[in-house]
Design a protein with these regions (language model features):
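Juxtamembrane inter-helical linkers in multi-pass membrane proteins
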Residues: 32-48, 124-125
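Membrane-water interface of transmembrane alpha-helices
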Residues: 20-38, 109-113
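Membrane interfacial helix-start motif at the N-side
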Residues: 42-63
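Alpha-helical transmembrane segments and their immediate juxtamembrane interface regions
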Residues: 85-125
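Alpha-helical membrane-embedding segments
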Residues: 64-80, 123-125
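Long, highly hydrophobic alpha-helical transmembrane signal-anchor segments
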Residues: 1-13, 72-86, 92-97
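Helical transmembrane-bundle signal
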Residues: 11-22, 66-73, 99-106, 110
């Protein structure tokens, strides 16, 4: 049972972190463009306008994805409460894989929004 609880907790980390980071990215983006913290891609670092837009868009997207992932993550895990450690491990691998794809996929959506809103020099269209 301890393994199930540990894996349950681990599976909840990504959606919860997405919710927390999403809130802070959209409401309190880093004040300056930097290479340490924040949504850092070539396009997002063109100027402060692209920087703020990227953080607001990504933050809102992560809030939606965090909520979207949280409920199924909980529901999927419930039937595994008395399963073997192997079954729980495989379930965790699949759930966290899906969550990881959601995080990476968010980059595609943010970059598309940046390219739709700004030209290649970071000037609004």
């Amino acid at each position: 049972m301890w393994f199930y609880i540990m894996m349950f907790t681990c599976n909840l980390l990504i959606p919860i972190v997405m919710l927390i980071c999403g809130f802070f990215m959209s409401k309190y983006p880093p004040k300056e463009i930097n290479g340490i913290i924040g949504y850092r891609t070539t396009m997002s670092r063109k100027n402060m306008d692209t920087w703020k837009f990227a953080h607001d868009y990504c933050g809102k997207l992560w809030l939606k994805l965090g909520l979207l992932l949280l409920t199924p993550t909980i529901i999927i895990q419930i039937p595994f409460s008395h399963s073997s450690e192997n079954a729980i491990g495989y379930m965790t691998l699949i759930v966290e894989g899906i969550q990881f794809v959601a995080i990476l996929g968010s980059i595609v959506f943010v970059e598309r929004a940046l390219k739709k809103t700004f030209d290649e020099n970071g000037i609004r269209r």
